[in-house]
Structures are given as C-alpha cells and as structure tokens.
Amino acid sequence: MKNITSSSTCSTGLLQLQNNLSCSELEVAEKTEQQAVGPGTIPSPWTPVNAGPPGALGSADTNGSMVDSKNLDVGDMSDDEKDLSSADAEGVWSPDIEQSFQEALSIYPPCGRRKIILSDEGKMYGRNELIARYIKLRTGKTRTRKQVSSHIQVLARRKLREIQAKIKVQFWQPGLQPSTSQDFYDYSIKPFPQPPYPAGKTSTAVSGDETGIPPSQLPWEGRAIATHKFRLLEFTAFMEIQRDEIYHRHLFVQLGGKPSFSDPLLETVDIRQIFDKFPEKSGGLKDLYEKGPQNAFYLVKCWADLNTDLTTGSETGDFYGVTSQYESNENVVLVCSTIVCSFGKQVVEKVESEYSRLENNRYVYRIQRSPMCEYMINFIQKLKNLPERYMMNSVLENFTILQVMRARETQETLLCIAYVFEVAAQNSGTTHHIYRLIKE
C-alpha cells in the first residue's frame, strides 16, 4: 500500500527545477570568466546583498561531491585555510563575495550531476567548484564547494519561505476567491504536502461490490478507473485558441486509453491519508467512502501540462473546457458532480446530468466540451504567471478536485475520483498515475 509522508517542497521542487535546466551557457561563461577584472573593479548588475536573493537561484547542486579532488583548483579546506579571518569564515559572506556568488550563479546554470570541461585547461569541474573558483578569481577570497553548496541551500530555503508566505496572502486574491464560501481560506489548515508516492503493493482485481471476489475476465477491472458495472473511458481538460485563422488545442490533463491484461494491477493508497484534503461535511470523501461501494474510489496524481506560450484569456474568446466519457452495463441517468477544493474546503461545485446511448450492448455517456467556470480559468492563468515550476507546485499542494458519478434515481455512487496535481516538466506533456483507494 502507498504511504504518503510529508516532505519538503523546497527539496523536491527545486531539484526538479534544477534537472530541467541545461548547460548551454557554459561556453559563453568560460569566455566571460577569462575577461574577469580584479577585485574592487567589478560592475554589479545584481541587487545588493541586503535586498535578498534574486528570483531564480536554482537548487542545491550536488555535483561537487562527485568530482575528483585532484582536478580542483578550489577544494576542501586545508589546515592553513581554516585559519582564515573571521570575515572569510564559513557562513559569513561579505558583499563582494555575495556579488561574485550571484554572478557565478548566472554564468554557470545547474547541470545536475554532470561535470564541465573548461577547454583552456582540460579539467573537469562540478558547478559548485566553478562558482568557488569564480569567487576566488574575482575577490581573492576562498570559498569551498561545500560552502557554496550550503549557501545555495540556505538561500533557496529562504526564497521558498518568502514565496509561500506571499502565496498565502497574495495568490488567492479577489477574482479567484469565491464569494459564496466564507471558509475558503483558513490559516489553521496545513498546506497539502505532495510527496511522490513510494512504491507499494498492488491491488487485487475487483469484480464485485466488495473485495475478495475472484477477478473478472474484463481487462480494465483492477487496472483502470472502473468497477464491474461502470468505468471511465476518457477525461480531458483543455483549452482551445484561435489566432489568425489558426486553431490550437492544448491539453492540460488527459486520462484514457485501453487497458489490457498485460498492464499491471493498480497500486493502493489508504484513503485516510487524504481525508483532510477534501471536504469533511456530509457528502464529503469520508462520508461517501463509508456509504460505499468501496471499490468505486480512486486517486489520480496528475502532472498538468501548463507549458504553452500562447497568450490566453476569457476576454479573447478562448475556450477552457472538459470532455469526459463513461460506460455502464446499466441504463441510468448519470449525475456528475465536480468539486474544486482549496485547503480541504469546497470552493465551487458543478453538477451535470447525462443520458445514455446504447452502443455495442453498453450504455455510453458523453459530456462534451463542458465549459470551465470563471474561477478555474482565473486559477490556471494566475498559476501560469508564476515564474518558476516549484512555485506552481507550492500552490497546487493546496488544490484538489473531487469528482463523483451517481445514478440519479438511486443516488448510488458509481465512481468517485480524487485528483491531486503537480506541474509537468518542460516539454514532457501531461502524465498521470492512478491508485485504488482502500481502508485497512
């Protein structure tokens, strides 16, 4: 079973950000370093030290620890170096050192665990060693790669705290904030941690209302969002844009596909770990699960694709919508409820009804191009305007969606899907992972 534990948004968000950056500026950086002037004559395009770190520091770089010390110009401290003056002691960064440090961050972008070869020397360096080397050349003062790594982490944590504080106060501004809910934001509610789910055991296939029944011969049972009587065929959240007679369609989230017997069975997550991420009132996730059927509950972790450079907005006539499709072996009137939640509280709810169409001896339900509400459009646009991916993920820690499909006449829950989100990496497209919710 999956075990969700709290983890540092700083470490996951920043390391993900680091791995997406490239070393394309290294050759230019080398030339810039060779043209460096001596101490005291450095022109500064950076903000002063007391103004705080710049907006994009990158993440703590671990590549320094992987480099052979024989190739270092600036390595670990020797005994003589430990006798440096207090102004140069570890943790003390004078303005000239800080300025050179910030310049080096810009010159040498994060490169993961790769090493960099300087063509004039033929030596291999990690990023932290290059930063330490740059500081030495510019200021004449020594900083080791370990001190550089520690300083990067300190500044990154400080920056993340500042961002999270601003998000609480500034992100949820009028225009996003619903007028119908007074408990939309509660400072006593802890943010929703979004750690990656560690590997857990797989579930057994379910073919009845309770577990323990032998597996069905249908390939989707136990491998997709489905029960023996009802299943999700497709779910797509998208925007459509038309510019100069050119039509664009961008997918934020997409679920679907045809499962086969070769697909692995779904892994499980204890539903109690996410109860506080969704409304607790009557009709909330906990209440629904207790009423059952318990084989109808699923968790979907979505990596939403926000990587589009197209300028959008409701005022330009762009369309934001959702298309979903379901299949049943019973003819019922389907009621689909979609609840958007923030900090575990309901923000808005949309309820739609759909009648079936008989196709290939199955009853099919299609909810086509259902428009997103103004709240969701504003939320996506504000999220896209955040400058860094880890900032977006920090916001999404507190954002969830609960979707409940019921039969109108009996009010039986046919499917209940809990969605949590992160932002997809650059150029990776949208992906997702499905878990079956259980209670042990």
Swiss-Prot record:
Compartment(s) where it occurs, according to its Swiss-Prot or TrEMBL record: Nucleus
Annotated DNA-binding residue span(s): 86-162
Annotated keywords: Activator, Cell cycle, Developmental protein, Differentiation, DNA-binding, Metal-binding, Nucleus, Transcription, Transcription regulation, Zinc, Zinc-finger
GO CC, alphabetical: nucleoplasm; nucleus; RNA polymerase II transcription regulator complex; transcription regulator complex
Superkingdom: Eukaryota
Chief location category: nucleus
Family matches, as InterPro entries: TEA/ATTS_dom, TEA/ATTS_sf, TEC1_TEAD_TF, TEF_metazoa, YBD
Tissue: Subset of neuroblasts in the central nervous system and in the peripheral sense organs of the embryo. Expressed in the developing wing primordia initially along the D/V wing boundary, and by the late third larval instar, maximal expression is seen in cells at the D/V wing disk boundary. Less expression in cells located farther from this boundary. Also expressed in wing progenitor cells.
Region (Disordered): 32-65
A GO term, aspect molecular function: RNA polymerase II cis-regulatory region sequence-specific DNA binding
Record-level GO BP terms: cardiac muscle cell development; compound eye morphogenesis; embryonic organ development; hippo signaling; imaginal disc-derived leg morphogenesis; imaginal disc-derived wing morphogenesis; negative regulation of DNA-templated transcription; negative regulation of neuroblast proliferation
TM spans (from-to): none
Gene3D superfamilies: 2.70.50.80, TEA/ATTS domain
Pfam entry (one): TEA
Record function comment: Transcription factor which plays a key role in the Hippo/SWH (Sav/Wts/Hpo) signaling pathway, a signaling pathway that plays a pivotal role in organ size control and tumor suppression by restricting proliferation and promoting apoptosis. The core of this pathway is composed of a kinase cascade wherein Hippo (Hpo), in complex with its regulatory protein Salvador (Sav), phosphorylates and activates Warts (Wts) in complex with its regulatory protein Mats, which in turn phosphorylates and inactivates the Yorkie (Yki) oncoprotein.
Subunit and interaction comment: The C-terminus of sd interacts with the C-terminal serine-rich protein domain of vg, to form a complex which acts as a selector for wing development. Interacts (via C-terminus) with yki (via N-terminus) and this interaction enhances its transcriptional activity.
Protein name as catalogued: Protein scalloped
Organism for this UniProt entry: Drosophila melanogaster (Fruit fly)
Taxonomic lineage of the native organism: Eukaryota, Metazoa, Ecdysozoa, Arthropoda, Hexapoda
